[in-house]
Amino acid sequence: MNAEAIIRSIEAEQLKDDLPTIHVGDTVRVGVKIKEGTKERVQPYEGTVIAMRNGGINETITVRKIFQGIGVERVFLLHSPLVDNIKVIRRGKVRRAKLYYLRDRVGKATRIKQRFDRPI
């Protein structure tokens, strides 16, 4: 067994198997574990998936939302223990793999059409 196979077998144990199918353009709500002192709580972060990066245990999604008129982006490691849950709110109909052009848009121009052919 070479080193790469050993690494893959260790990573396979850490992968989450309860993740929903997520696509670019979807609106998702990510529950993030926040530790404040001795207490731990789950903070929801809702926004549009503008990018996905595959790579086994290093799989990430970039979620963008507008907060008080300012665009906020956050990158989540999907298999991280800090990500408690992910729920797809609505499916988006897009024709690009990365939606970085939404960064330059303001207001109603940032809306994405809803997709009805994929179940939530």
Swiss-Prot record:
Cellular component, GO, one term: cytosolic large ribosomal subunit
InterPro entries hit by this protein: Ribosomal_bL19, Ribosomal_bL19_CS, Ribosomal_bL19_sf, Translation_prot_SH3-like_sf
Name assigned to this protein: Large ribosomal subunit protein bL19
Organism: Picosynechococcus sp. (strain ATCC 27264 / PCC 7002 / PR-6) (Agmenellum quadruplicatum)
Swiss-Prot/TrEMBL keywords: Ribonucleoprotein, Ribosomal protein
Keyword Cytoplasm set for record: no
Biological processes annotated in GO: translation
GO molecular function: structural constituent of ribosome
Stated role: This protein is located at the 30S-50S ribosomal subunit interface and may play a role in the structure and function of the aminoacyl-tRNA binding site.
Family under the similarity heading: Belongs to the bacterial ribosomal protein bL19 family.
Lineage of producing organism: Bacteria, Bacillati, Cyanobacteriota, Cyanophyceae, Oscillatoriophycideae
Keyword Amino-acid biosynthesis assigned: no
